[in-house]
Regions:
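Glycine-rich phosphate/pyrophosphate-handling loop used in enzymes and phosphotransfer proteins
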Residues: 1-202, 206-248
C-alpha cells in the first residue's frame, strides 16, 4: 500500500467522521455498508463465466457454452453475486452520489485482483458517454479504478478509452440486443495503449457485452492483454432484471 492509496482512504474516513453515513444497504446509521449487510453478500469463490454467470469447470472466465472466437478479454472476475443489499449499495454508488462507496468497494476488488494474480500496467474505468457524465457528474467505475491504481502503483487513464456513441439504456435487453447496441460504441487511443496490459474496471458485469466490446477496442488499439473486473456479477436468470448502468 503506497502513500496515495493511504491518503485516499484517509480522506474518505475523515469525511465519514465529519458526516457519519447511513448504510447503503439497510440504512443503519454510522457505517457506509454495515457488517450485517456485508455478511449477506454472496461472494464469488469459484470461477464463473463472464457472459452467463455459470461456474466454469476449468477455472477460465468463459464457459464452454459461451466460448466463441469473439471473446476479446483475457480474463474476467467479480467480487460478489449481484443482489440483495449489495444491489442497493451499487445503486447508491451510481445514482445517489454516495461516492465514498467507491473507495470502500475498491478494497475488496484489490483482494480479488491479488487472488487472480493478474499482471497489468494500466488501469482504465468503463467510460460513460458525455451526456451521462454531465447528468451524473462522475463516473462510478472511476471511483473504483483510481484507488486500485494507487494501490498497485500503476498509471490510470480515463481518456485512453472513450464512449463515442450514445446507446441509451441497456436495462432489460438480452446479450444479443446489447451486442448490437454496443457495436462501434468505444474508441481506444493507440498512443496510450500500445503494448499495454490493461485492467478494465466496472461496477457490474451483466451479460459481458460491455467488457467484451471495450476489450475489443483496446486490443485493436494495440493493447496486449485485457483483464476485466467488477464489484458484482449477475447470474443468467437475472440478466433481464439487472439495473446495470446504461453507460451512455
Amino acid at each position: 500500500m503506497n502513500i496515495l492509496f493511504a491518503l485516499h482512504r484517509l480522506f474518505w474516513a475523515a469525511a465519514d467522521w465529519l458526516y457519519p453515513p447511513h448504510c447503503a444497504g439497510c440504512g443503519h446509521h454510522g457505517e457506509r455498508f454495515c457488517a450485517s449487510c456485508l455478511a449477506q453478500v454472496v461472494l464469488i469463490t469459484d470461477a464463473r463465466c463472464a457472459f452467463c454467470g455459470d461456474k466454469t469447470s476449468d477455472g477460465s472466465s468463459v464457459c464452454m457454452k459461451c466460448n466463441r472466437n469473439s471473446v476479446s478479454f483475457n480474463a474476467a472476475a467479480s467480487w460478489a453475486v449481484y443482489g440483495g443489499e449489495l444491489r442497493k449499495a451499487i445503486h447508491a454508488l451510481k445514482y445517489r452520489q454516495d461516492m465514498a462507496l467507491g473507495a470502500f468497494f475498491a478494497t475488496f476488488l484489490i483482494a480479488t485482483i491479488e487472488k487472480q494474480g493478474w499482471n497489468f500496467d494500466l488501469v482504465i474505468p468503463i467510460p460513460l458517454s458525455p451526456d451521462r457524465m454531465k447528468e451524473r457528474g462522475y463516473n462510478q467505475s472511476e471511483l473504483l479504478s483510481r484507488p486500485i491504481a494507487f494501490y498497485f502503483q500503476v498509471p490510470h487513464s480515463s481518456m485512453a478509452l472513450i464512449r463515442i456513441k450514445d446507446t441509451g439504456t441497456q436495462v432489460n435487453h438480452t446479450k444479443i440486443e446489447r451486442d448490437l447496441m454496443l457495436k462501434d460504441t468505444f474508441y481506444a487511443n493507440p498512443d496510450k495503449l500500445n503494448g499495454r496490459k490493461v485492467l478494465l474496471v466496472d461496477d457490474i458485469i451483466t451479460t459481458g457485452s460491455t467488457i467484451n466490446h471495450c476489450a475489443k477496442a483496446l486490443k485493436e488499439a494495440g493493447t496486449s492483454e485485457v483483464y476485466a473486473l467488477s464489484i458484482a456479477k449477475t447470474l443468467k436468470k437475472d440478466h433481464r432484471c439487472s439495473d446495470e448502468t446504461n453507460k451512455s
